[in-house]
Amino acid sequence: MSIGILGKKLGMSQFFDEQGRAVPVTLIEAGPCRITQLKNDDTDGYSAVQIGFGETREKLINKPAQGHLNKSGEGLLRHLREYRVDSVEGLELGGAITVGDFEAGQKVDVSGDTVGRGFAGYQKRHGFSRGPMTHGSKNHREPGSTGAGTTPGRIYPGKRMAGRYGGKKITTRGLTILKVDSEHNLLVVKGSVPGKPGALLNIRPALRVGAKPANGGK
């Protein structure tokens, strides 16, 4: 049973399928993650599993967090995530979550922070068309009109403008696992995932599997 796992993006490569076609893939070093806490309905009001990933130094973890992590075994972990489950039966504190819990062909959702690009303008951030570059034009990369004057006399909230681009958490849904390498803790996932190489990723079973009905399910 796959609950979810934390991993690190290694980069992109290509994978040849049975027909010899080159498929773009992302290599993810996932786990092993340690179960750091088990929650149940009696004590916490819901059932969940908390896992940790990525060892770190003692000076970077405060004392309460150290005490919490020491209950599940040796080694201080940098990243913690919690996953809701129906029941925690069969799981034990200090147990390991590995890529072996996943299988080839399984659909997963991958969450992570996108590459931060800093303050960006209208063209780069939103794909606006630029103005004329010659013939005396001074409106090269400006946005153009942002609204009327007297009415409404203001710029509506949510107007697409220049600002910080990237550096936000997003989820890429429905990616297919093409290969599981338990020896090297690797997941080979079809397509791209958020972030740059070295970024932390949260991989969990897909919430929605299969195509959505064209008529909305009616």
UniProtKB/Swiss-Prot annotation:
GO biological process, one term: translation
Segments forming a coiled coil: none
Pfam family membership, one: Ribosomal_L3
Region of interest (Disordered), residue spans: 124-162
Keyword RNA-binding: yes
GO molecular function: rRNA binding; structural constituent of ribosome
Origin superkingdom: Bacteria
InterPro entries listed in its UniProt record: Ribosomal_uL3 (IPR000597), Ribosomal_uL3_bac/org-type (IPR019927), Ribosomal_uL3_CS (IPR019926), Transl_B-barrel_sf (IPR009000)
Keywords assigned: Ribonucleoprotein, Ribosomal protein, RNA-binding, rRNA-binding
GO cellular component, as recorded: cytosolic large ribosomal subunit
Sequence intervals crossing the membrane: none
Cross-referenced PANTHER family: 50S RIBOSOMAL PROTEIN L3, LARGE RIBOSOMAL SUBUNIT PROTEIN UL3C
Record's function text: One of the primary rRNA binding proteins, it binds directly near the 3'-end of the 23S rRNA, where it nucleates assembly of the 50S subunit.
UniProt xrefs under NCBIfam families: L3_bact
Family: Belongs to the universal ribosomal protein uL3 family.
Subunit structure: Part of the 50S ribosomal subunit. Forms a cluster with proteins L14 and L19.
UniProt-recorded name of the protein: Large ribosomal subunit protein uL3
Highest classification ranks of the organism: Bacteria, Bacillati, Cyanobacteriota, Cyanophyceae, Synechococcales
